[in-house]
A protein has these predicted regions:
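Acidic, histidine-bearing metal-coordination/catalytic regions of metal-dependent phosphoesterases
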Residues: 6-10, 14-146, 167-168, 225-228, ...
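Extended active-site neighborhood of metal-dependent phosphoesterases/phosphodiesterases
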Residues: 104-107, 115-132, 192-232, 290, ...
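Conserved hydrophobic beta-strand signature of PAS-family and PAS-like sensory domains
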Residues: 269-272, 278
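PAS/PAS-like sensory domain cap-loop motif
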Residues: 278-289
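Sensory helix hotspots in PAS and closely related PAS-like folds
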Residues: 279-280, 295-299
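Active-site-proximal segments of metal-dependent phosphoesterases and phosphodiesterases across multiple
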Residues: 355, 371-412, 430-434
Length: 520
């Protein structure tokens, strides 16, 4: 008995000594990601011609009512800069944990292939000067970096992938993100982590992004809004619902700061019990909630759906923090998610694979018909060919693939499946256990290469990948794509910078692209 007691004492002593910071609590998200008068979340995007325009957005707290940007052609002596000043468009933004102002400026009438210096602020408090370079007006060679889903543990595990990619391609023209940049569409802390990963790089290398399913708000009975004691809305999610007793509902709750609680509600809607977790989440004491309704004018919590109309909507963060082209799209919800940009002989097209896929077909046909660029690259989140066991985007493939084939699109960049797969010429005798249509994933008479990739730590299992030339599981990746007049070189690297896959596409007159395997 004494020996067992001494063992326990020794074990707990060692445990306490091993964790000297065990009493330290997590720094609150609302403080870690709070806006200040100083600009943060500075991002370059394009909403027009990359050779003559450049858009920049940034965030401050609401005390900054007027945002300003200064711009000059860069020179070797910073003190000799004579910048022009531009007033930003400023909009109020309320997230789940804070209020902010977003500011946006589009610099216009710029000179092609020119290095500019700019900074943003309020006239007193300025950022450092950033550089950006406008696109050339000709088909000069360039490189860009492509990322699949970042999504989870973005600050912890995705940041290193982005930074390794930047080490390999510091002169990249832009970064391209194929959706699911974050996990919870409207969680400000997750968007804050996404900005922290690239940090200042987003302010000097522009961003192209297409939305994933996690950027979209969907109708869900589990995602709800309450009002806390201070009158502020709080987002919560119902983790479980136990109604073994038909007159009493036991509801387990988790908010977006990962705080949990349990509440008991009568079938009539009256609260009959609440634990300490509910007190922490709502700010109400238990006795303030007991016998109060959860619905109606006197309800302290006022439970309601986050998305009562059931219409899928892109994240509230998407449009204030990015400024993508607003083009003649067939549905208002597709603004800045369905768009195209031309960059030095390449047409880049973002399709929105989350909503209204059918009505995008006519828009896409027109964009492809009017395309006089030498190369065409399309990005959308959900892949036409999925290596994951429970996924097959048949309807999307039926709608979009005929157009990709007709116009011989060169490259399709996707995410969603948390794996790596890349199509190419394969031995058809080895193709098995795949859905109908996967046999034509790569057709040398068409030449389109489809890539699925993942940059974050969340991973899925490959169960039907025999259609692909190259596959990968449990590997965080980034891709560097080099484009010149007649060649497209594609390289995929692991998070540690090791070459994982490589191929070359060669343009041929009046023939499909020639695909040359050059990788390990």
């Amino acid at each position: 008995m004494h020996r067992f007691f001494y063992f326990l004492t020794f074990f707990f002593s060692i445990t306490l000594l091993s964790h000297p910071n065990s009493s330290i609590e997590k720094y609150p998200d609302e403080m870690a990601h709070a806006p200040t008068p100083l600009p943060d979340r500075v991002v370059l995007t394009w909403n027009d011609d990359p050779a003559t325009t450049q858009a920049v957005t940034w965030r401050t707290d609401t005390s900054i009512e007027v945002g300003l940007a200064q711009l000059a052609i860069a020179n070797a002596n910073g003190r000799a800069l004579k910048p022009d000043e531009f007033k930003a468009e400023t909009s109020y933004f309320e997230s789940d944990i804070n209020e902010a102002h977003y500011h946006s400026v589009t610099f216009k009438n710029l000179q092609p292939n020119t290095l500019y210096a700019y900074r943003v602020g309020d006239g007193v408090n300025w950022t450092e000067y950033y550089h950006f370079k406008t696109a050339s007006s000709s088909e000069d060679p360039f490189s860009f970096i492509y990322f699949g889903d970042a999504q989870n543990e973005v600050r912890t595990h995705w940041s290193r992938v982005f930074r390794e990619a930047f080490r390999d391609a510091p002169r990249a023209a832009f970064t391209l993100h194929a959706g699911d940049l974050i996990d919870e569409h409207n969680m400000d802390s997750q968007w804050g982590e996404w900005h922290q990963g690239p940090d200042w790089v987003n302010g000097t290398i522009p961003v192209i992004a297409t939305p994933g399913n996690h950027e979209y708000q969907k109708d869900s009975e589990t995602k709800r809004i309450w009002t806390n004691k201070d009158g502020q809305p709080i987002n919560i999610e119902i983790e479980s619902l136990n109604n073994d007793n038909p007159e009493i509902f036991i509801v387990d709750i988790e908010d977006f700061q990962n705080r949990t609680g349990t509440i008991k509600i009568k079938d009539s809607g009256e609260i009959i019990d609440a634990d300490e977790g509910i007190e922490l989440i709502t700010g109400y004491k238990r006795e303030e909630l007991i016998n109060k309704p959860i619905l109606g004018g006197k309800a302290p919590l006022y439970d309601r759906l986050q998305n009562p109309d059931g219409i899928q909507k892109v994240s509230n963060h998407w449009r204030p923090q990015f400024s993508f082209p607003i083009q003649n799209v067939p549905d208002e919800r597709l603004k800045e998610t369905l768009y195209y940009l031309d960059y030095q002989g390449v047409r880049f097209i973002s399709l929105d694979s989350n909503i209204e896929m059918e009505i995008q077909v006519d828009w896409l046909r027109k964009v492809l018909e009017e395309n006089d660029n030498r190369w065409t690259i399309i990005t959308f989140h959900h892949p036409l060919y999925s290596p994951a066991s429970d996924r097959d985007n048949f309807e999307m493939r039926k709608l979009w693939k005929p157009l990709l084939d007709e116009f011989k699109v060169d490259l399709v960049l996707s995410g969603h499946d948390h794996t790596y797969s890349r199509t190419g010429l394969i031995d058809e005798k080895k193709v098995e256990n795949i859905p109908t249509g996967y046999q034509q994933a790569y057709d040398p008479e068409i030449g389109t290469v489809h890539v699925v990739s993942v940059s974050g730590p969340k991973m899925y299992e490959i169960t039907k990948g025999s259609y692909a030339k190259k596959l990968g599981e449990n590997t965080q990746l980034y891709q560097i794509i080099d484009i010149s007049k007649d060649n497209l070189r594609f390289r995929a690297y692991t998070a540690t910078g090791k070459l994982y896959d490589e191929f070359l596409l060669k343009k041929r007159k009046d023939q499909p692209n020639l695909l040359i395997e050059t990788g390990p």
